[in-house]
C-alpha cells in the first residue's frame, strides 16, 4: 500500500513495471513499453537531469523551492483545496471548511468577513513543505471585484494552479485570471475540482479550456467514476490507479486499473503523448518514430513544455471529498518551475532603464519587490519577494522609488494571519517585513544598485459612492480607516467632491466598496451613511482643435500675463498613457521655467470636462508658441492661461462621454433564455455569445455598467431564482448621442440648482 504522510517524510518508492516481466495487460504494454522504473512519486526526480557537482550551493536549495498561487473563478473550491494542501503537508492538523460551518473557518480565510461570506477577499500567504520541497502558496480571491489581489500575487509567483469547477466549467473570472497569468508569463497546471458534484463533466471542462482559454492542454489523470460514484484517479503517466482512504483521505493506496477502463486509459494516454509531442521536439521524435514512451520521458517532456508555457497539464479531483490533492502536489513540484528556472528582469535606473537579468544568486546585490501592504497587529506589514541577494533582520535597505534608507526591524514568514520570525531570507523567498513605509510596487535594494522591477498593472475604478460618518466624533477614525485602505489596495481610491464637499470612495464594484464600508464599521467602529452607487464616466475628444489664449490682468499692483498657443488631439487607440503633454516651442517665446506650470494647468483643466464634469482622458496637448512679459509673467499666469485655453478649445474638439462597459456572463435555465436575452437588449447590452450547457443557456454580453444596478434582483425574478451571473470590467466606450444628451442635461440641471 502506498501511503502519503501528512508531514515531510522520505520519498516513496514505487516499482511500476519491469523490463524482464510483461505488463499486466495488452493495454498496459502498449502504453508503457518495456522499461524498469523506480519512481520518487512526490519529487518528480525522473524529470531532473544529473546536476553538475560544481553548481553553487544555493542553486540546489532553490531547486527545492516553489512559489505558487492558487487562482480561480469564485466558488470553484480553491480555498478548500488550499486547506487540504496545508493538512497533507502537516502545516495544520485538522481540516476546517469555508463559511465557518464548524465555527472556525478555513485557515487561509483569516478575516471574519471572509469566513461569514465564504469568499476570499485578501490574498493570504503561507509556507509549507511537501516531502523535501519548500512551497510558498498564495491563496487569491475569485471575485472579480478583488482582481488586484490576483494581479499582485501573480506578479511575484513562479507558477500557479488554475482551479476549474467540473460543473461550472470555464467561467468569466477563469478567463480573467488566465489572462493575468499570461500577462505575467506564469506557467500553470489546471485542477478540475468538484468531481463528486452532480453534473460533473471533466472532459467538457477540458474542451472549454482549450477553446475559451486557448490552452494547449491534456489530462494527466482519468477519474474512476463521477458524481457520487467518484472513487479515485488513474495516473496516465505511470498508468496506475490511486484511491484515497482514511477519514481525511490521507492514505493514498495504489491499485490496479479497473478492467472496464483500460480502453479509455489507453486512448487518453495516447492523446496526452500526442498533445505534448506537438510542443516538445524530444518527445515528438519518439512519437513520430512510433517508439514506446516511458513514464520518465513523458514526465520530463511535460515539465519542459509546462515551464516553457507551451502546455498546461490537467489534474482532477475533489478537494472537499479529500481526493486528488496529493497527486496535484506532486504535479506542482514535478512540473512547475523553481525560482532559478524563471527569467526575472529589473530596470537599471542608472542606465536609461536598461533591462538587467537577475541571476537569483544570494551572493548578488539585494533586489526585492513590495507587492502587498497590510495593517497588522504590530503595524504595517509589507510583503516582499526577494529576487536576488539576501535580506537580514537589522539590515539597512534602500527604497529605490523614494530614495529612503530604511532599517529592517523584524522579518517574518507568514502563515495566513499567523507569523514566524526569521533572521534572513534568500533570493526566491516570499517574506514580510514590519515597520517599512512604502507603496505597493516599490523596489528595495542594498544600495549598491539602482534597479526597479516593472510596475504591476492596476485597473482603474469603475464605481463610486459618497460616504460620511454618522457621528462627527468619528472623523479621526474615519480618515484613519480610509488612509489605511488606500495604502493596502491601489484600486480603492478616496477623493472629495469639490461641489458637495462629500467624501467619495471608488473601487471595482459594489461588493468591493461594501466590504470596505463594513470593514470600517468592524475594525474602526465607524458607522457610515452611504450614497447611491455612481458610475465613473469619463470624457474624451474625437478630433484636433487649436488654441491661442492670452491671460492678461494688469489693473494695478502685480500683473498677470501669459499667452499659450498650440493644439489638442486624441491619442491613438490603445495608448498606455491617458494624458500627454509636448512642448514644441522653438526659442524662448515662453521661458522654460514656466513650462511645468502650463502642463500643470492643462492637467488640472482635464480633471473636469465641461460635458458632465468627469475626467478627460486619451488626450495629447502640444504647445507650439506663446508670449511672456518681462515683469507680469508668472507661473500662476501661465497656469491660468492653460486652464482657460483648454476650456475654450474643448467644444471644438468634439468631446464625447465614455461609460464603463461590463462583460456579463449569465447561466440560466433554457426556458428563461428568451426573457433574459430580451432584458439584456433593453439594458442596451450586446450579446456576444450563447452556448448550451446541459439544461442551461450560457449568455455572454457587453452591457453598460450604468444599466446593471439592481440586476441581481431582476434576474432572480425572471428565472424564479435559478439564474446566476458574473460581470467584470471590459472597457470604457462612447455612449450613444441620446444617452450623452440625457447625461449633459442632467449635469446642467444639477449645476443650475446649486
UniProtKB/Swiss-Prot annotation:
UniProt key word Chaperone? no
The biological processes this protein is annotated with in GO are: mitochondrial translational elongation
In terms of InterPro entries, this protein maps to: EFG_II (IPR041095), EFG_III (IPR009022), EFG_III/V (IPR035647), EFG_IV (IPR047872), EFG_V (IPR035649), EFG_V-like (IPR000640), EFTu-like_2 (IPR004161), G_TR_CS (IPR031157)
Which keywords does this Swiss-Prot/TrEMBL entry list? Elongation factor, GTP-binding, Mitochondrion, Nucleotide-binding, Protein biosynthesis
Give the tissue specificity: Expressed in cotyledons and adult leaves at the same levels.
List the molecular function annotations (GO) for this entry.
Answer: GTP binding; GTPase activity; translation elongation factor activity
Residues annotated as domain tr-type G:
63-340
Pathway assignment reads: Protein biosynthesis; polypeptide chain elongation
Q: Which residues make up the binding site for GTP?
A: 72-79, 139-143, 193-196
Subcellular location per the Swiss-Prot or TrEMBL entry: Mitochondrion
> Where mainly found?
mitochondrion
> SMART domains under this entry?
EFG_C, EFG_IV
Provide GO CC annotations from the record. Answer: mitochondrion
Indicate yes or no for the key word Protein biosynthesis.
yes
- One Pfam family named in its UniProt record: EFG_III
Q: Which PANTHER family match?
A: ELONGATION FACTOR G, MITOCHONDRIAL
Q: What does this protein do?
A: Mitochondrial GTPase that catalyzes the GTP-dependent ribosomal translocation step during translation elongation. During this step, the ribosome changes from the pre-translocational (PRE) to the post-translocational (POST) state as the newly formed A-site-bound peptidyl-tRNA and P-site-bound deacylated tRNA move to the P and E sites, respectively. Catalyzes the coordinated movement of the two tRNA molecules, the mRNA and conformational changes in the ribosome.
Q: What else is known?
A: This protein may be expected to contain an N-terminal transit peptide but none has been predicted.
Family per similarity comment: Belongs to the TRAFAC class translation factor GTPase superfamily. Classic translation factor GTPase family. EF-G/EF-2 subfamily.
The entry's protein name is Elongation factor G-2, mitochondrial
Q: Tell me the organism.
A: Arabidopsis thaliana
Recorded name of the encoding gene:
MEFG2
Amino acid at each position: 500500500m502506498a501511503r502519503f504522510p501528512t508531514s515531510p517524510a522520505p520519498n516513496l518508492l514505487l516499482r511500476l513495471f519491469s523490463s524482464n516481466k510483461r505488463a499486466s495487460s495488452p493495454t498496459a504494454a502498449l502504453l508503457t513499453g518495456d522499461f524498469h522504473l523506480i519512481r520518487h512519486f512526490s519529487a518528480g526526480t525522473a524529470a531532473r537531469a544529473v546536476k553538475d557537482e560544481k553548481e553553487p550551493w544555493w542553486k540546489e536549495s532553490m531547486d527545492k523551492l516553489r512559489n505558487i498561487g492558487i487562482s480561480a473563478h469564485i466558488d470553484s473550491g480553491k480555498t478548500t483545496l488550499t486547506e487540504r494542501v496545508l493538512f497533507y503537508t502537516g502545516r495544520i492538523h485538522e481540516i476546517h471548511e469555508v463559511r465557518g460551518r464548524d465555527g472556525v473557518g478555513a485557515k487561509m480565510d483569516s478575516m471574519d468577513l471572509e469566513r461569514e461570506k465564504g469568499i476570499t477577499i485578501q490574498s493570504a500567504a503561507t509556507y509549507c513543505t511537501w516531502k523535501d520541497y519548500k512551497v510558498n502558496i498564495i491563496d487569491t480571491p475569485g471575485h472579480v471585484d478583488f482582481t488586484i489581489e490576483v494581479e499582485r500575487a501573480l506578479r511575484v509567483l513562479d507558477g500557479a494552479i488554475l482551479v476549474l469547477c467540473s460543473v461550472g466549467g470555464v467561467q468569466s473570472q477563469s478567463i480573467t485570471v488566465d489572462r493575468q497569468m499570461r500577462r505575467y508569463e506564469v506557467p500553470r497546471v489546471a485542477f478540475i475540482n468538484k468531481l463528486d458534484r452532480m453534473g460533473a463533466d471533466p472532459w467538457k471542462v477540458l474542451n472549454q479550456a482549450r477553446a475559451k482559454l486557448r490552452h494547449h492542454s491534456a489530462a494527466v489523470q482519468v477519474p474512476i467514476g463521477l458524481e457520487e460514484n467518484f472513487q479515485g484517479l488513474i495516473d496516465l503517466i505511470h498508468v496506475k490507479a490511486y484511491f484515497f482512504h482514511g477519514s481525511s483521505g490521507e492514505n493514498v493506496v495504489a491499485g490496479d486499473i479497473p478492467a472496464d477502463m483500460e480502453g479509455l486509459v489507453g486512448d487518453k494516454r495516447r492523446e496526452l503523448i500526442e498533445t505534448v509531442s506537438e510542443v516538445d521536439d524530444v518527445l515528438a521524435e519518439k512519437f513520430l518514430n512510433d517508439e514506446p514512451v516511458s513514464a520518465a520521458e513523458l514526465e520530463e517532456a511535460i515539465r519542459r513544455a509546462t515551464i516553457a508555457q507551451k502546455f498546461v497539464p490537467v489534474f482532477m479531483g475533489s478537494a472537499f471529498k479529500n481526493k486528488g490533492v496529493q497527486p496535484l502536489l506532486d504535479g506542482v513540484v514535478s512540473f512547475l518551475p523553481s525560482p532559478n528556472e524563471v527569467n526575472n528582469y529589473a530596470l537599471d535606473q542608472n542606465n536609461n532603464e536598461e533591462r538587467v537579468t537577475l541571476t537569483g544568486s544570494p551572493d548578488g546585490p539585494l533586489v526585492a519587490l513590495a507587492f502587498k501592504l497590510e495593517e497588522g497587529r504590530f503595524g504595517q506589514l509589507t510583503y516582499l519577494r526577494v529576487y536576488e541577494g539576501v535580506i537580514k533582520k537589522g539590515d539597512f535597505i534602500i527604497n529605490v522609488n523614494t530614495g529612503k534608507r530604511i532599517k529592517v526591524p523584524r522579518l517574518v514568514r507568514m502563515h495566513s494571519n499567523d507569523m514566524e520570525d526569521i533572521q534572513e531570507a534568500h533570493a526566491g523567498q516570499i517574506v514580510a517585513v514590519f515597520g517599512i513605509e512604502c507603496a505597493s510596487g516599490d523596489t528595495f535594494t542594498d544600495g549598491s544598485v539602482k534597479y526597479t522591477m516593472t510596475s504591476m498593472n492596476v485597473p482603474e475604478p469603475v464605481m463610486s459612492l459618497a460616504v460620511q460618518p454618522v457621528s462627527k466624533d468619528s472623523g479621526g477614525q474615519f480618515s484613519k480607516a480610509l488612509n489605511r485602505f488606500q495604502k493596502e489596495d491601489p484600486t480603492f481610491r478616496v477623493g472629495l467632491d469639490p461641489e458637495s464637499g462629500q467624501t467619495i470612495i471608488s473601487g471595482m464594484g459594489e461588493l468591493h466598496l461594501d466590504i470596505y464600508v463594513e470593514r470600517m464599521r468592524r475594525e474602526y467602529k465607524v458607522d457610515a451613511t452611504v450614497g447611491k452607487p455612481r458610475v465613473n464616466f469619463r470624457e474624451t475628444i474625437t478630433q484636433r482643435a487649436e488654441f491661442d489664449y492670452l491671460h492678461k490682468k494688469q489693473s494695478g499692483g502685480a500683473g498677470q500675463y501669459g499667452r499659450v498657443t498650440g493644439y489638442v488631439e486624441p491619442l491613438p487607440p490603445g495608448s498606455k498613457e491617458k494624458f500627454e503633454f509636448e512642448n514644441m516651442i522653438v526659442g524662448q517665446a515662453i521661458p522654460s521655467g514656466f513650462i511645468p506650470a502650463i502642463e500643470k494647468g492643462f492637467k488640472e483643466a482635464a480633471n473636469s470636462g465641461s460635458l458632465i464634469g468627469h475626467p478627460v482622458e486619451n488626450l495629447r496637448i502640444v504647445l507650439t508658441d506663446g508670449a511672456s512679459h518681462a515683469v507680469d509673467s508668472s507661473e500662476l499666469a501661465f497656469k491660468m492661461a492653460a486652464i482657460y485655453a483648454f476650456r475654450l478649445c474643448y467644444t471644438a474638439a468634439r468631446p464625447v462621454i465614455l461609460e464603463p462597459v461590463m462583460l456579463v456572463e449569465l447561466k440560466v435555465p433554457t426556458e428563461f433564455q428568451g426573457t433574459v436575452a430580451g432584458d439584456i437588449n433593453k439594458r442596451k447590452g450586446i450579446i456576444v455569445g450563447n452556448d448550451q450547457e446541459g439544461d442551461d443557456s450560457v449568455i455572454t454580453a457587453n452591457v453598460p455598467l450604468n444599466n446593471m444596478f439592481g440586476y441581481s434582483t431582476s434576474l432572480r425574478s425572471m428565472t424564479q431564482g435559478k439564474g446566476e451571473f458574473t460581470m467584470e470590467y471590459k472597457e470604457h466606450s462612447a455612449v450613444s448621442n441620446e444617452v450623452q444628451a440625457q447625461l449633459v442635461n442632467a449635469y446642467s440641471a444639477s449645476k443650475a440648482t446649486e
